[in-house]
């Protein structure tokens, strides 16, 4: 069943007005975790052990993304936001496969796609090829390579880019700007110890960038909406204690900063859960993973002073 939630956010009203009609549509997907087919040289114990310790349908990730892309082409939104974890583990071949087979198809159809990295996407020691009982490392991407691969999906058309991270600002419509925040800690990943850091934080320099860009947007007469991978508001009471790595570090202060910057809504992912929650600062619209049940994506329509957030789930794939 599709789930529709109506939110009364004046911050997004300009989206409808900017298009010259009463409605404006965008879609949101998260945690695509696409695994390029060539990463599975030979199925065997190594890949099956990996799957048994995870909750992702990695072997079906390409087919899932193909089905979702066809759904999005049918929806034909103005904008698609992808809130991080684009790949299984930051493999260069997975990033290229996602762009070449899916994102480029959406772009050619007229959908403007904007991405932000997740904790799996950059400088990841877990980027491997599975070959029977063994694995071997394969090429991951650096921050600059990530921006190059996704040049047509946020970085080339950015109004401004943060020198300290992969954060950027883009114009979504007349009167509305996107602040895409990179809060990942990929520079702390350790190849010797095979550690990929799950948690996130916003660097002081990036916080200054966000404030400066929010001020520039205000002076230009624009409202702002934010997307990032890590959560800003807890989605259940114990989350800050039992699963703090799924919230950005010092999340209360981050929420206050975003509120002060005029951002009412933050689109997030990371937790592979589908939820919308609000505290005294912002509303966190968390979108679940495409490769985890129930494989959701969101369709967001703005009409007047109402924003409807509709959740659709992928029920089946051909295989």
Residue ranges and their predicted role:
Residues 9-17:
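Hydrophobic h-region of N-terminal signal peptides that target proteins for export
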Residues 16-92:
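N-terminal active-site segment of His-dependent metallophosphoesterases
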Residues 23-36, 175-189, 227, 283-288, ...:
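Active-site-proximal beta-strand elements of phosphoester/diester hydrolases
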Residues 31, 80, 85, 98, ...:
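Divalent metal-coordination and catalytic microenvironments
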Residues 35-38, 88-90, 119-127, 186-189, ...:
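Active-site environment of divalent metal-dependent phosphoester hydrolases
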Residues 72-79, 112, 177-180, 191-283:
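His/acidic metal-ligating clusters that form di-metal
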Residues 97-209, 307:
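Extended active-site neighborhood of metal-dependent phosphoesterases/phosphodiesterases
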Residues 172, 282-319:
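Binuclear metal-dependent phosphoesterase catalytic core
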């Amino acid at each position: 069943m599709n789930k529709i939630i109506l939110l009364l956010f004046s911050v997004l009203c300009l989206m409808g007005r900017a298009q010259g009609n009463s409605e404006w549509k965008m879609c949101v997907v998260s945690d695509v975790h696409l695994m390029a087919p060539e990463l599975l040289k030979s199925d065997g114990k190594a890949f099956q052990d990996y799957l048994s310790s995870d909750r992702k349908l990695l072997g079906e990730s390409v087919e899932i993304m193909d089905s979702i892309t066809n759904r999005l082409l049918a929806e034909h939104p103005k904008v698609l936001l992808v809130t991080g974890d684009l790949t299984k583990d930051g493999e260069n071949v997975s990033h290229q496969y996602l762009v070449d087979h899916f994102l480029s198809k959406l772009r050619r159809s007229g959908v403007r796609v904007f991405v932000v990295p997740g904790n799996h996407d950059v400088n990841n020691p877990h980027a491997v090829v599975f070959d029977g009982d063994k694995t071997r490392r394969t090429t991951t991407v650096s921050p600059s390579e990530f921006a190059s691969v996704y040049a047509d999906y946020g970085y080339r058309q950015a109004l401004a880019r943060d020198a300290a991270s992969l954060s950027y600002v883009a114009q979504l419509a007349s009167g509305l700007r996107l602040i895409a925040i990179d809060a990942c800690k990929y520079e702390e990943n350790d190849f010797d110890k095979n550690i990929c850091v799950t948690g996130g934080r916003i660097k002081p320099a990036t916080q200054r960038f966000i404030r400066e860009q929010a001020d520039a947007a205000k002076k230009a007469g624009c409202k702002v909406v934010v997307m990032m991978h890590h959560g800003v508001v807890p989605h259940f009471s114990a989350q800050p204690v039992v699963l703090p790595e799924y919230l950005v570090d010092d999340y209360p202060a981050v929420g206050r900063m975003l509120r002060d910057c005029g951002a009412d809504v933050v689109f997030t992912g990371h937790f592979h859960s589908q939820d919308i929650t609000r505290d005294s600062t912002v509303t966190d619209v968390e979108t679940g993973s495409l490769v985890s049940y129930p494989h959701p994506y969101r369709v967001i329509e703005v009409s007047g002073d109402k924003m409807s957030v509709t959740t659709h789930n992928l029920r089946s794939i051909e295989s």
